[in-house]
Amino acid sequence: VAQMAPGAAGDVAGAMVEANPDGAAEMAATVAENVPGAAGAIAGAIAEADPALAAEAAGAMMEANPAAASAAAAGMANAAPEVAGDVAGAMMEVAMDPEFATDFAENAATANPDLTPDQLDALVDNFAGNAVGAIAQGMAVGDPDIAGDMAGIMMDAAMANPDMAENFVGEIAGGMAAGAPQ
């Protein structure tokens, strides 16, 4: 549905979540991986249909396709701002997971065999920060009124890993500014 009729994807996803809430995270991951352009609509539909499923679905989307993070965060923040903090936390948990960065590096090396080890190291070093910035931007776009609160929540989550936190301050601020420049 997401590929053939993207405009209807959100409505269909909402109905699917209501019919089978246990499949929401798997559906979200599949869409993020295969039809990233529909990630925002699907994420918003899941959050609207059952806000309690939003964080798990957001984490699954982040794992499946980090490039869909901003759209997914925006969709969820717009549909259910009351769970935006949980959503951001779940997405940041994935972004900050060293195993996830390792998987990202392996996939990048396979897809780009001409990368030097230094270039690959730089990609991995920037991966988590870029992902966190995308999450922040998505949250701010989804609901500019919660941007300030979300920045604080995201910084608290970043402090769970103080070694990485210093890199996230600028990414969170930059993402929020890009998403809600007012």
Q: Which residue ranges define each predicted feature?
A:
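General marker for long, soluble alpha-helical cores
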Residues: 1-182
